[in-house]
Regions:
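Start-of-repeat signature of ankyrin repeats
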Residues: 11, 45, 78-79, 112
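Ankyrin repeat domain, specifically the short helix-to-loop turn at the C-terminus of the second helix
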Residues: 29-36, 62-70, 96-104, 132-138
Length: 408
């Protein structure tokens, strides 16, 4: 039976009231001036932490956690946890905060649904991906200590935090993965060690018996393939350095070639064929990455191969992303970066206003591709809108056709 609200003190009632009104400064004052336990519950069995998660207020949640709130506590009448409420709120950063404080990912409510399943039910796909891609820090700490006959750990201890963040990335577009590797302190300089740790993680995920996680195993494999491609690119650049003089460093567009290995690879990933606009190098790389997954009997491998081998298959990057993060419905209003496919890209090309990017860096990297079409896109916005409408209609027809042909 749920507790009665009549049993709450005036201070406890005030805390609930301030949380529900998102009054952050008042909550901060109440918590700092009154050293109380914050795991009390209201008439529905909800704690202050659960209320703050329901509101999606990360700042208040952080205050409550700092005050000692139990991330898994609660007496909710339908067994919803704080992570359930955070997932329903749509705040992926809040979900990550709770999980980093020990929130149970597999906790189920009264209808047997986990936080990730509830997030998927209401269409909060970012929360689903964040929860499914979360990895406990303890899984990484194993590799920062020498094991068995090893004379040194596989992963230098000072790289543990940046590596942990790198492997939990949700956006697995190869351009974004390469950029994240470059931006993570120390990882690019230790790319060979990073690749070996990823391969070890892949093997461990596939040898856990009943707890085998094919999705995470493939994700580790895929990340290791991107790292390996950067290593190969670096070796090619090193071999070329002694063979070419400064004049040979001028490319076909009359610009000086960049010595940045990651940028060279990104430009290869982005370069599209003139005939059909498909990024051929990226497509070939991703298909080869799938083929190289060593666990051929796994369900995830068979599904991806079957999809890519079908007639008129989707892009390889969409297949890889769906395998790791799950399928998701259409979202016509989603603003996706044209360079790395990061969502909520708010920066538009200042000339044509037809494409969007995460930031100036993504726009710069994509400019060599976009500049050929920029003027045309800017001159005929009505035609572009018409084309998009036709594309949406075509996609809708194809999807409906596929659904009708599914076996009963």
């Amino acid at each position: 039976m749920a507790p009665s609200k009549e049993g709450l003190t005036d201070l406890q009632k005030e805390i609930f009231d301030k949380i529900n009104k998102n009054e952050v400064s008042d909550i901060k004052t109440l918590l700092s001036t009154n050293k109380i336990k914050v795991d009390f519950v209201d008439e529905n069995g909800m704690s202050p932490l659960q209320h703050a998660c329901y509101k999606g207020n990360k700042e208040i949640v952080q205050m409550l956690l700092d005050q000692g709130a139990d991330v898994n506590a609660g007496q909710h009448e339908h067994a919803y946890t704080a992570l359930h409420f955070a997932a329903l709120s749509g705040n992926a950063d809040l979900c990550h905060l709770l999980m980093s404080h020990g929130a149970r990912l597999t906790a189920t409510n009264s209808v047997g649904r986990t936080p990730a399943q509830m997030a998927a039910f209401v269409g909060n796909h970012n929360c689903v991906a964040t929860i499914n891609n979360f990895i406990p820090k303890a899984d990484i700490d194993y590799f920062v200590k020498a094991q068995g006959l090893q004379t040194e750990p596989m992963l230098p201890p000072h790289l543990a935090d940046s590596f942990h963040k790198f492997i939990m990335q949700v956006n697995v577009h190869p351009v974004r993965v390469a950029m994240n590797l470059q931006r993570s302190p120390g990882l690019l300089e230790n790319a060979y060690k990073i690749q070996k740790v990823l391969e070890a993680l892949r093997h461990r995920e596939m040898t856990r018996g009943a707890e085998t996680n094919e999705v995470m195993a493939f994700k580790y494999h895929y990340l290791s393939c991107v790292v390996a491609e950067i290593i190969k690119c670096q070796k090619r650049q090193d071999a070329m350095k002694g063979e070419k003089n400064d004049k040979d460093k001028i490319n076909e567009e009359g610009e000086e070639k960049k010595s940045d290995v990651v940028e060279i690879l990104i430009r290869k990933f982005l370069k599209c064929s003139k005939s059909d606009g498909i990024p051929e190098y990226q497509e070939a790389f991703l298909r080869e990455s799938v083929r190289e997954f060593p666990f051929r009997e796994s369900t995830i491998f068979r599904q991806m191969v079957a999809t890519l081998a079908g007639t008129d298959p989707p892009s390889a990057v969409s297949v890889v992303s769906a395998a790791i993060n799950g399928q998701r419905g259409f979202n016509d209003n989603a603003l996706v970066c044209f360079t790395c496919e990061e969502e909520k890209a708010s920066k538009k090309c200042s000339k044509c206003k037809a494409v969007q990017y995460c930031d100036r860096e993504c726009q710069r990297l994509h400019w060599s591709m976009h500049k050929k079409a920029c003027a045309r896109l800017g001159q005929s916005p009505s035609q572009n809108t018409k084309t998009l409408d036709v594309d949406k209609e075509h996609i809708s027809n194809v999807v409906n056709s596929k659904l009708q042909n599914l076996p009963n």
